């Protein structure tokens, strides 16, 4: 009986020591909470740039990585739900501001496709991702990041469509 009591006592002490050693979980940022409250992407939050696919990660530069709160691969999360839709790629939170960016070939012939994608994104945010939509956005929240060379003629009617849709273009997404 005494042996059993000693074993039980040691197990209880080990459990208490483990609980004391565990690091406290960091507070969740508003972006993470909003994602977790959005049914279609509830498991999609990743710390830092981890949700961004390998080569695409090089297209995002943060001046201060401590302000980079998290990312969401929208396309991968909702692909099964909207297989035939023109889905937007990513959302990212930096310094409590949300950036939505699409990595895509930057050619005049692709403007219509990217405009369709941003229309889909705005509709999805308003109807399915209202918690994410409520978050503060960057000054220019919809960014088309070129995946290769830049071949968009600045004076075309397609370029005006891009501007009217609120999309800005960039070689890289520069944060901060």
Q: Language model features by range: what are they?
A:
Residues 83-87:
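Short, flexible loop/turn motifs enriched in small residues
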Residues 72-80, 100-101, 105, 132:
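N-terminal low-complexity, charged segments
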Residues 107-124:
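Mg2+/Mn2+-dependent nuclease catalytic core
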Residues 78-82, 106-110, 149-153:
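Short acidic, S/G/P-rich loop/turn micro-motifs used as interaction or catalytic elements
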Residues 7-8, 13-32, 133-176:
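Domain-level recognition of nuclease-like catalytic cores that cleave nucleotide substrates
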Residues 90-92, 96-107:
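Conserved catalytic cores of phosphodiester-cleaving nucleases, focusing on short active-site segments
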Residues 2-82:
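Acidic-basic catalytic patches of nuclease active cores, encompassing PD-(D/E)XK
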Residues 123-136:
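Arginine/glycine-rich "motif VI" loop of SF2 helicases in the C-terminal RecA-like domain
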């Amino acid at each position: 009986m005494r042996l059993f009591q000693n074993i039980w006592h040691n197990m209880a002490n080990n459990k208490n020591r483990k609980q004391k050693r565990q690091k406290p979980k960091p507070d969740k940022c508003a972006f993470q909470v909003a994602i977790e409250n959005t049914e279609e992407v509830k498991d999609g939050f990743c710390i830092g740039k981890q949700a961004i696919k390998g080569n695409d990660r090089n297209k995002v530069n943060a001046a201060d990585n401590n302000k980079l709160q998290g990312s969401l691969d929208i396309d991968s999360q909702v692909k099964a739900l909207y297989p035939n839709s023109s889905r937007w790629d990513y959302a990212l939170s930096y310094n409590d501001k949300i950036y939505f960016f699409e990595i895509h070939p930057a050619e005049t012939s692709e403007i219509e496709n990217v405009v369709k994608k941003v229309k889909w994104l705005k509709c999805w945010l308003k109807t399915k991702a209202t918690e994410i939509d409520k978050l503060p956005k960057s000054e220019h929240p919809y960014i088309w990041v070129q995946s290769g060379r830049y071949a968009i003629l600045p004076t075309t009617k397609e370029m005006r469509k891009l501007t009217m849709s609120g999309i800005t273009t960039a070689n890289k997404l520069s944060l901060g």
